[in-house]
Amino acid sequence: MKFGKRLKRQIEESLPEWRDHFLNYKELKRRLNAVSSPDPAAEARFLALLHAEVDKFNAFFLEQEEDFVIRQRELQERIQSSSSAAAEMEGRVRREVVDLHGEMVLLLNYSSINYTGLAKILKKYDKRTGGVLRLPVIAGVLRQPFYATDLLSSLVRDCEAIMDAVFPSLPSPSAAAAAAARAAAEQAIFRNTVAALLTMQEVRSGSSTYGHFSLPPMTPLPDSDWLIQSVQPPPPPPPSSPLIIPT
């Protein structure tokens, strides 16, 4: 699948309030198609749009990350202060934990797919114009807040630890997370999370070579494999052996 279609699909599957914050790949391609040779004025306009897109990513990413930190802290405090909470409260906390975990995974995907879009459009620009924009621009992008996902990945793991805490009767974090997600399987956030995980896998498997512009390996999320498998159809059964009738 071409990247433009993959990005369009991912935007459609994202949370409605997130959709305006993704890369405007279509407009960047339109600007690119208007340039056929090195042109300082056209390059300046292209770079201005590119930098505006990066600023948009940074503002949205940092806002969401800060919100996640606050929500996770509040959840931890509620769990610690209500060890004998009513069943209704426990159910609400569990749903909030699942939603928070899902939104964090969506933000990891947001970082991944927007970076990939920038790298691809810059590669197209250099190929079309014979320029050398990609290397210096990507070097700057690698230092941008939206690309720095260490804190976010840590929050995901902390959230998985909270899942374990709110499902004390289950034998393992994976089982706890599985039960939480099954309870939320009809929610849009669940489907969006699975779509994000699949997209991250697709993006990283799109190239067999490693280079300066490659995404870092996807940090494994301990409970993501079963999440993906839970909505994928089972593999077809092996073909049966032909019936041999003795003569």
From Swiss-Prot:
Pfam families: SPX
GO-annotated cellular components: cytoplasm; nucleus
UniProt domain SPX: residue ranges: 1-139
GO biological process, one term: cellular response to phosphate starvation
Keywords: Cytoplasm, Nucleus
Subunit structure as annotated in this protein's UniProt entry: Homo- and heterodimers with SPX3.
Organism: Oryza sativa subsp. japonica
Purpose: Functional repressor of PHR2. Involved in maintaining cellular Pi homeostasis when plants are exposed to an external change in Pi. Negatively regulates root-to-shoot Pi translocation redundantly with SPX3.
Entry's induction text: Up-regulated under phosphate starvation. Down-regulated by SPX1 and SPX3. Up-regulated during cold stress.
Name listed for the protein in its UniProt record: SPX domain-containing protein 5
Domain of life of the organism encoding this protein: Eukaryota
Feature: compositional bias, Pro residues: 232-241
Region of interest called Disordered, as start-end residue ranges on this chain: 224-247
Compartment(s) of residence: Nucleus; Cytoplasm
Tissue: Predominantly expressed in roots. Expressed in root epidermis, exodermis and the sclerenchymal layer. Under Pi starvation, also detected in mesophyll and phloem in the vascular bundles.
InterPro entries: SPX_dom (IPR004331), SPX_prot (IPR031142)
Coiled coil stretches, renumbered: none
Stored PANTHER family: SPX DOMAIN-CONTAINING PROTEIN 3, SPX DOMAIN-CONTAINING PROTEIN 5
